[in-house]
Amino acid sequence: DYLTTDTHNPLEQNYYEKGIEEINQKSDLIIFTDDVEWCKNNSFFKKKNIYFAHEFTKSIDILDLCLMTKCKNHIIANSVFSWWGAYLSHQEKVIAPKYWFKNTKNSNLKTEDLIPNSWIQIEN
C-alpha cells in the first residue's frame, strides 16, 4: 500500500540494516510483512536467524499484533500497525524512522507527538 501512496515513503533496506546495528543483538529476528515473497528473494533476509511471522500467525492481523507485543525490541516501519505493535509491548528498544511522511524534511508536517521520547529515531 505504501508503494502507491503520496503520504509515506517505503523504507529502504539500509534503514533496517541500521536498525539491526542499533539494537546490536544476535538474537532471532521475526519479520512482519505483507510482502513475504519480496523479503524471501532479498539476500538481506536470508540470514539463518530470521523468521517470518506468517509462519506462526498465518498472516492473521490480530495474531501478528499479539506476537509483536511479545517482542523485546522493534524496528518499525512508518506504519500505524507496526507503531501499535511496538507501543503495546514492553520493549527494551524501539527503532523508528526519523522521517515518517514523504517530504517531512521540507514540510510543515510535525511528528514530535508521534514518536515517544524513549524510542530511537534513525535516518531513513
Predicted regions and their residues:
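Core catalytic architecture of nucleotide-activated donor-dependent transferases building glycoconjugates
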Residues: 1-59
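Low-complexity, compositionally biased segments
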Residues: 4, 37-38, 67, 116, ...
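Intrinsically disordered regions, especially transient/low-confidence alpha-helical propensity segments
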Residues: 12, 35, 80-81, 97, ...
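Short, glycine/charged-enriched secondary-structure capping and boundary segments
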Residues: 44-47, 89-91, 109-111
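Residues at the C-termini of beta-strands that transition into short coil/loop
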Residues: 54-56, 98, 118, 123
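A donor-sugar binding/catalytic signature common to diverse glycosyltransferases
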Residues: 61-107
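Leloir-type glycosyltransferase catalytic cores
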Residues: 104-124
